[in-house]
From Swiss-Prot:
It comes from Shigella flexneri serotype 5b (strain 8401). This is DNA replication and repair protein RecF. The gene is recF. One of its GO terms (biological process) is double-strand break repair. Keywords: ATP-binding, Cytoplasm, DNA damage, DNA repair, DNA replication, DNA-binding, Nucleotide-binding, SOS response. Its main location: cytoplasm.
């Protein structure tokens, strides 16, 4: 699946843009603040319903406008799909697929699997466990049809259970919630464990190519003690949970621990090495999706040249080309990306929200 056409209206500093895109590499070149990252963010928002730089809708809609509008055309092997997203200042969204309204953002996410690599993406490695849970959950969402519903129900039940912890005095009063929560927690944990095991070889191979000087290990932690039933953990920790007023153990506390030579990667790797590792993990995830389902990711890479020397940029470019995926790359100068260009690439110049090719 590739994005062949992109229409942007009143998004960030872009009043209007209508772009015909390459199924291969698309380069966005311009000075800082020109709007090149806004194009990447528009694509991301079209596939996620939210921006990656700000959760405040007022920051995303162009100044003095009431809503942004994004439209795209996706070309698959057998058919073309028209998609659209409109979002107003109140945060109300309208999703359109093939001319019909009433669709969910999750449907857009399924149609447009994408990997985002930004200068802020180090949080995957040096941020809290929630960022690595999101990494695992992306894979589960695209590989397990029932994952999104189970995950949504889990979030709802945990919220209800945490509210109940402020009211109850005996564990028996929590059983109605735990009866539903326990099988969901175990199923989600199983999916995550299977996904982390399945992608392990891809992560290992890609990381060896990008960072051969380190021995990297990946360990999935499910969020409660190994070899212990979740039902037992919940009942045993009732008094502590009641004092905390939240559920201290479960899949919402899971993590993917990543170590280099036995130590946490954030304590061992330089910023350039952390970026290489982040890129390696995103590539591995995309390649695993292609092998398992035949679907390809869109790759969005903001500020391609930052933290990477010429050799590492060349390595990343060659691996991206090998995926045969659609890639969007922003850079301050065309010199940073010209070596990646070929006859199928498109180069866009961005200046003050205006985009030309």
């Amino acid at each position: 699946m590739s994005l062949t056409r992109l229409l942007i209206r009143d998004f960030r500093n872009i009043e209007t843009a209508d772009l015909a895109l390459s199924p291969g590499f698309n380069f966005l070149v311009g000075a800082n603040g020109s709007g090149k990252t806004s194009v990447l963010e528009a694509i991301y928002t079209l596939g996620h319903g939210r921006a990656f730089r700000s959760l405040q809708i007022g920051c995303v809609i162009r100044h003095e406008q009431e809503a942004f509008v994004l439209h795209g055309r996706l070309q698959g092997e057998e058919r073309e799909t028209a998609i659209g997203l409109t979002k107003d200042k109140q945060g109300d969204s309208k999703v359109r697929i093939d001319g019909t309204d009433g669709h969910k953002v999750a449907e857009l996410a399924h149609l447009m699997p994408m990997q985002l690599i930004t200068p802020e993406g180090f949080t995957l490695l040096n941020g809290g466990p929630k960022y690595r849970r999101a990494f695992l959950d992306w894979g589960c969402f695209h590989n397990e049809p029932g994952f999104f519903t189970a995950w949504s129900n889990l979030k709802r039940l945990l919220k209800q259970r945490n509210a109940a912890l402020r009211q109850v005095t005996r564990y028996e009063q929590l059983r109605p919630w735990d009866k539903e929560l326990i099988p969901l927690a175990e199923q989600i944990s199983t999916w995550r464990a299977e996904y982390s095991a399945g992608i392990a070889a891809d992560m290992d191979d890609t990381c060896k190519q990008f960072l051969p000087e380190f021995s990297l290990t990946f360990s999935f932690q499910r969020g409660w003690e190994k070899e212990t039933e979740y039902a037992e953990v919940l009942e045993r920790n009732f008094e502590r949970d009641r004092q905390l007023t939240y559920t201290a153990h479960g899949p919402h506390k899971a993590d993917l621990r990543i170590r280099a030579d036995g130590a946490p990667v954030e304590d061992t790797l330089s910023r350039g090495q952390l970026k290489l590792l982040m890129c390696a993990l995103r590539l591995a995830q995309g390649e695993f999706l292609t092998r398992e389902s035949g679907r390809r990711c869109l790759y969005l890479i903001d500020d391609f040249a930052s933290e990477l020397d010429d050799e590492r940029r060349g390595l990343l470019a060659s691996r991206l080309k090998a995926t045969q995926s659609q890639v969007f790359v922003s850079a301050i100068s065309a010199e940073h990306v010209i070596d990646m260009s070929d006859e199928n690439s498109k180069m866009f110049t961005v200046e003050k929200g205006k985009i030309t090719d």
